[in-house]
Amino acid sequence: MANSPHGGVLKDLLARDSPRHAELSTEAETLPALLLSERQLCDLELLLNGGFSPLEGFMTEQDYNGVVKENRLASGALFSMPITLDVDQATIDELSLKAGARITLRDFRDDRNLAILTVEDVYKPDKALEAKEVFGGDEEHPAVQYLYKTAKDFYVGGKLEAVNRLQHYDFVELRYTPSELRAHFDKLGWAKVVAFQTRNPMHRAHRELTVRAARSHHANVLIHPVVGLTKPGDIDHFTRVRVYKALLPRYPNGMAVLGLLPLAMRMGGPREAIWHAIIRKNHGATHFIVGRDHAGPGKNSKGVDFYGPYDAQYAVEKYRDELGIEVVPFQMMTYLPDSDEYAPVDQIPQGVRTLNISGTELRARLRSGREIPEWFSYPEVVKVLRESHPPRSQQGFTIFLTGYQNSGKDQIARALQVTLNQQGGRSVSLFLGETVRHELSSELGFSREDRDKNIARIGFVASELTRSGAAVIAAPIAPFEQARQSARELVEKYGDFYLIHVATSLEYCEKTDKRGIYKKARAGEIKGFTGVDDPYEAPAKPNLVVDAETQSVRSIVHQIILLLESQGLLDRF
């Protein structure tokens, strides 16, 4: 029999409200509507299907404050993560959000009405307190960054009524709700279920870890990966799910089931481990594996861990009686080549030879095409990963040239395009500053905001082309560091980004200006001209610095080609 839900009752709002579906659907069409973001949709889905039981809606101020300060809802029930609906003042005014108001919550992807929210309160959270108490306060933490840079200033609390399930078009057969997963366990006759949380591909060590956990507790295994929002830079869930499906036959027949969890992770370490345990309990699991640095985001820019390696295990141990799910702490598994087996690191005698491949090393091997040994992963898993990670010679990249008007960046970009076309193997796209201004950003001016929008558009287009394996050459002025960095972050989701500072002096750019643009700017005929009456922020960390005053275009292009070659991007075989 599946474990009882957190709080004793599964708050399956979809099942509860299905008799009123026609009535609620009609009302939803008449109410003011709020389009939810991707993260809000993840939260809503687990609120509607009972994954966040005992919650029946987004947290009110009383619940929110209790969770932030004490891991407690107003009822006294244990809950460790704030589940909130953030809005801005304009939305409050537009939708007349106040206690008693009813609004429709809508999917931004297809305008589908999903739920009706009855507002209980609208409040301004103490974000600094939330950042400190829930996530540890480090400003580099992904969740803290989200709080300050993305989340709106106000939260809306209230109860939900379900109108429709969210529509999914991928791996639908694996997207079990808590009720469906519980029924599946009952059908299989499983009395004990060990749940395994992951946001990464699984390899031999993970298979060994989960089988050991099942063996020691006479249980079966629920592989329960997150397919909502995870850490930026993680391998996409499409690839990961194909990996899990490839791995499943490696378990003894009937031992393991794969189910997908549409969770938006916060990377909250100890707090998140408690939350994950509650979610798995609601899905019927009796046991939950908590490993080293569970749900931690790794290290900050100074190389300091956001959390201690076993903080998450200590946190769930503290609340184990209340959680009502047995936590299975596990050390990292490592390979012993002399005996051809895996073992937990804390059980390996001193002097025994071990081997391991880190996530960073694995990604490097995938990018370079180097061998991934069979002791580390199964051939069928590696095959899936390689399908999503082509060799370097087939990966896209972006060359982003920045510098003053008439610095030579356009000539360099054109010459580089010709050189790469001669090389072959990839399509090559060229985005010169004036071309982009004419074709993509004709309505934009030259205020800082408009300049940043222009670079954001270039970054978006470059990222999509990079993802599809193209070579992209962009040569805008791009005077501001933050906009350039944002473009880098967009592109680096899918491939390499190389920032080339064309550091030709302003004096030389002006002296050799045959079009007379600088002269017009000096005369006041052109306003907001970079280098004259608008600033240029030199790149802090360019990949390459060149100067068209002292170097020929040919030699600069050769330097860029050598840079690309050194990264394996121009290998033909």
From Swiss-Prot:
Chemical reaction(s) catalysed: sulfate + ATP + H(+) = adenosine 5'-phosphosulfate + diphosphate
Pathway membership: Sulfur metabolism; hydrogen sulfide biosynthesis; sulfite from sulfate: step 1/3
Positions of sulfate binding: 197, 199, 295
GO biological process: cysteine biosynthetic process; hydrogen sulfide biosynthetic process; methionine biosynthetic process; sulfate assimilation via adenylyl sulfate reduction; sulfate assimilation, phosphoadenylyl sulfate reduction by phosphoadenylyl-sulfate reductase (thioredoxin)
N-terminal: annotated segments: 1-169
Xref: Pfam families: APS_kinase (PF01583), ATP-sulfurylase (PF01747), PUA_2 (PF14306)
Enzyme Commission designation: 2.7.7.4
Region (Allosteric regulation domain), start-end ranges: 395-573
Binding locations of ATP: 197-200, 291-294, 333
Annotated S-S bridges: none
Complexes and interactors: Homohexamer. Dimer of trimers.
Reported function: Catalyzes the first intracellular reaction of sulfate assimilation, forming adenosine-5'-phosphosulfate (APS) from inorganic sulfate and ATP. Plays an important role in sulfate activation as a component of the biosynthesis pathway of sulfur-containing amino acids.
Protein name: Sulfate adenylyltransferase
Naturally occurring in which organism (per UniProt): Chaetomium globosum (strain ATCC 6205 / CBS 148.51 / DSM 1962 / NBRC 6347 / NRRL 1970)
